[in-house]
Amino acid sequence: MKNINPTQTAAWQALQKHFDEMKDVTIADLFAKDGDRFSKFSATFGDQMLVDYSKNRITEETLAKLQDLAKECDLAGAIKSMFSGEKINRTENRAVLHVALRNRSNTPILVDGKDVMPEVNAVLEKMKTFSEAIISGEWKGYTGKAITDVVNIGIGGSDLGPYMVTEALRPYKNHLNMHFVSNVDGTHIAEVLKKVNPETTLFLVASKTFTTQETMTNAHSARDWFLKAAGDEKHVAKHFAALSTNAKAVGEFGIDTANMFEFWDWVGGRYSLWSAIGLSIVLSIGFDNFVELLSGAHAMDKHFSTTPAEKNLPVLLALIGIWYNNFFGAETEAILPYDQYMHRFAAYFQQGNMESNGKYVDRNGNVVDYQTGPIIWGEPGTNGQHAFYQLIHQGTKMVPCDFIAPAITHNPLSDHHQKLLSNFFAQTEALAFGKSREVVEQEYRDQGKDPATLDYVVPFKVFEGNRPTNSILLREITPFSLGALIALYEHKIFTQGVILNIFTFDQWGVELGKQLANRILPELKDGKEISSHDSSTNGLINRYKAWRG
């Protein structure tokens, strides 16, 4: 993978000139000039997904210049490097192969000359056997009762992905009740334990090293709670499984290493739901549906790795994102799913994007002088419309938005879905085209009112429009289509990281806070006043000690 400063390319300079020509062009102008704009600026993924990017401040020339940037930054070479198992995570000397976890073609993928697919398939087979025993009731707890509840204990990628997917695919779930514990705040584990019975609960401890502070603190609290009821430590093996590679620590905890599900250092945490970390997904929706999830992602992997950049959906979305982030100065992107089951999707890609591309040092080790990853946020529609859409419509900040919705709902109650989708379509239209002063005044006339007497309020009812959006319409949210959608966003993030010349697959930014927390923890054990930090940190610690007594 090459290290190219994007701002030094000819394509970047051409884009800067083009931006000067485009900055005052409106989306309304673009549609007025081209009645065929939708067909030119939309694409489908099989019969599963339609991506409409026509309501953006772009022309065919814009996209051509952005494609030139991708070529100059050798995006095609970077894609080949990732899929071939090259160690593109150079700061940790690791390959990046979440694509191998869902490689349904079983084509060999090599790391250090060794095909990883046999090991991937062996773990999948183990997940299948284990999950079938739990779901069928064949697996019994220490009193002979079948498992009814599963508690996944993890944090970051070991929590966000499985939680998001099990919620998104709730229509496919079986009888098992799923719970997720991540926060080291004791309230999280305490509230979950109130809902479950030690005789019928299975805990999944998701930590590659089996040393993650938050996860192991929660796991030990769960173990203590369980043993208060079960008594004998030998029963731990019937109620705990590990998603880890540290067999020694897993065994010492009391977990049978036969129920330890491994993954590899070429699986990044925020890309790990496809691995053993996805065991909670398998237990929730069954192995066959999990395979469908993998198959959908694999289909998008094939699209990304083989489709020319001009028609490549992750590449197109990535380039449009760079256009706003690096030329228009937009600092955020909103992800707005119009489906309640998808309520954790934005939070999942908040980590997926911000932990991946929130970097200020480039691949050469130099501090960048251009913008890197955007701030990602969002909530499901229509809730967001009654919360933050005001700022998107009439605020002073540009917020490019992705609107996501299924054409077919899993819950066809009355006309709920038509009302939901009418809002989905209306919002992108309103954001693009707005509402002029003339229209506001005409509305007053139609109501029999004189606009002149209401002049003081007219400006507040004007919508400038020209707010960019992408619309992603799925036929239906299924395991397959969700897998494809997740992979679409993963590859968008990778593409942007390649072009921005940063390392997308490390996350050193999480380390400093952890180091300092480990230093501070012993200082909180007693009541002595602290003076070892800056005055602010000392003051906070000392007030905490005074108040806790």
UniProtKB/Swiss-Prot annotation:
The modification N6-acetyllysine is found at K80, K228, K234. GO terms for cellular component: cytosol. It catalyses: alpha-D-glucose 6-phosphate = beta-D-fructose 6-phosphate. Gene3D superfamilies: 1.10.1390.10, Glucose-6-phosphate isomerase like protein, domain 1. The keyword Acetylation applies. GO terms for molecular function: carbohydrate derivative binding; glucose-6-phosphate isomerase activity; monosaccharide binding. Pathway: Carbohydrate biosynthesis; gluconeogenesis; Carbohydrate degradation; glycolysis; D-glyceraldehyde 3-phosphate and glycerone phosphate from D-glucose: step 2/4. Its main location: cytoplasm. Belongs to the GPI family. Catalyzes the reversible isomerization of glucose-6-phosphate to fructose-6-phosphate. Keywords: Acetylation, Cytoplasm, Gluconeogenesis, Glycolysis, Isomerase. This is Glucose-6-phosphate isomerase. Its EC number is 5.3.1.9. HAMAP family: G6P_isomerase. One of its GO terms (biological process) is gluconeogenesis. The active site is at E355, H386, K514. It comes from the Bacteria. SUPFAM superfamilies: SIS domain. It is found in: Cytoplasm. NCBIfam families: PRK00179.1. The keyword Oxidoreductase does not apply.
